[in-house]
């Protein structure tokens, strides 16, 4: 996450927060009191800098040995060496034993926090807005609840914005303020889709073209159904999409408003164009160069930064040689 064009904050699964100074290539640790637990696929997850605060998704445990995804915030002021007054705003319910599918990405839009919550390997829960499993949640910046979106469901939680997801690891805002997410299917069925209130992507009644890892059908066996919101793009076989971001900047002006997508499985960065809900120009930008790609971000100049998901993770920058 960029603080400015010279400074990036990086989260590490085990709980470390680092500030990278791109001007002098130094790394310093940020002190914090986030009650993070590294468990399974969980740990310190996403981070967003907004109006002198950091908004963070992380894994938290309870004294029964169960875990969940949580959202919190804290003050972050110059000289950027400490998070102060940290508070947890939301704990996804219920806590579960599973160490899988925590999500999670965070986005600030129209004065609200949006965060993706994975279904933790308990897909049947993602059809019920009375819990947070397999959903997008929406809360105010101070953690209070917003307008209920699933009021037609008994006991629905007011912060549940969208349901029926498996493991959403990307969340991005377009130039016209539409929100999009990336979601991991099982054996096939990864997708990009709109984030819309009171909608349901169908997991695990449908599998978006994928199957269970043992080869059996998912739910009804249908790839899609008119009962559920349909993705704008899906992949069979899976590409394992993680972070996504809409491109803006002068470095690659021809890519303006295109969506950049990282792929863990195929170790690539690709881009797509979206117009009126239709996808075109799916193009691979980078493949098999830096390993599994976990994160992508763009600075104000339009330079693209990537973080690899390897034992020795590295930061990479993509610039346009035609502009040098």
Give residue ranges: language-model regions:
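Acidic, Gly/Ser/Thr-rich repeat motifs that build Ca2+-stabilized beta-propeller blades
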Residues: 1-123, 170-185, 237-275, 299-320
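Beta-propeller domain segments
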Residues: 42-44, 119-283, 291, 301, ...
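Hydrophobic residues at beta-strand termini and immediately following loops
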Residues: 30, 89, 161, 285-286
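Conserved strand-loop elements at the edges of beta-sheets that form or border functional pockets
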Residues: 2, 163, 287, 298
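Repeated scaffold domains used in trafficking and secretory/extracellular systems
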Residues: 293-295
């Amino acid at each position: 996450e960029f603080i400015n064009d010279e400074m990036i904050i990086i989260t590490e699964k085990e709980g470390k927060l680092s500030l990278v100074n791109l001007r002098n290539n130094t790394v310093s640790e940020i002190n914090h009191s986030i009650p993070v637990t590294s468990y399974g696929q969980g740990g310190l997850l996403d981070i967003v800098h907004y109006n002198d605060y950091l908004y963070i998704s992380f894994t938290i445990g309870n004294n029964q040995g169960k875990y969940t995804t949580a959202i919190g915030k804290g003050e972050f002021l110059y000289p950027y060496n400490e998070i102060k007054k940290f508070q947890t705003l939301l704990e996804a319910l219920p806590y579960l034993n599973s160490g899988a599918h925590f999500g999670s990405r965070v986005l600030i839009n129209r004065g609200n926090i949006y965060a993706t919550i994975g279904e933790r390997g308990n897909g049947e829960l993602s059809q019920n807005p009375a819990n947070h499993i397999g959903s997008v949640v929406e809360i105010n910046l101070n953690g209070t609840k917003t307008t209920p979106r699933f009021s037609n469901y008994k006991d629905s939680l007011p912060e549940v914005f969208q349901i029926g997801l498996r493991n959403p690891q990307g969340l991005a805002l377009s130039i016209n303020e539409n929100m999009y997410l990336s979601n991991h299917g099982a054996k096939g069925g990864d997708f990009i889709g709109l984030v819309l209130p009171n909608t349901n992507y169908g997991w695990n009644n449908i599998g978006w073209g994928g199957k269970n890892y043992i080869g059996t059908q998912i739910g009804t066996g249908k790839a899609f159904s008119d009962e559920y919101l349909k993705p704008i793009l899906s992949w069979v076989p899976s590409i394992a999409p993680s972070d996504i971001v809409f491109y803006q900047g002068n470095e690659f002006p021809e890519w303006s408003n295109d969506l950049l997508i990282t792929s863990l499985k195929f170790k690539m960065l690709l881009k797509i164009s979206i117009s009126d809900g239709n996808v075109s120009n799916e193009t691979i930008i980078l493949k098999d160069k830096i390993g599994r790609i976990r994160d992508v971000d763009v600075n104000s100049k339009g330079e693209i930064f990537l973080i690899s998901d390897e034992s020795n993770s590295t930061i990479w920058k993509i610039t346009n040689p035609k502009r040098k």
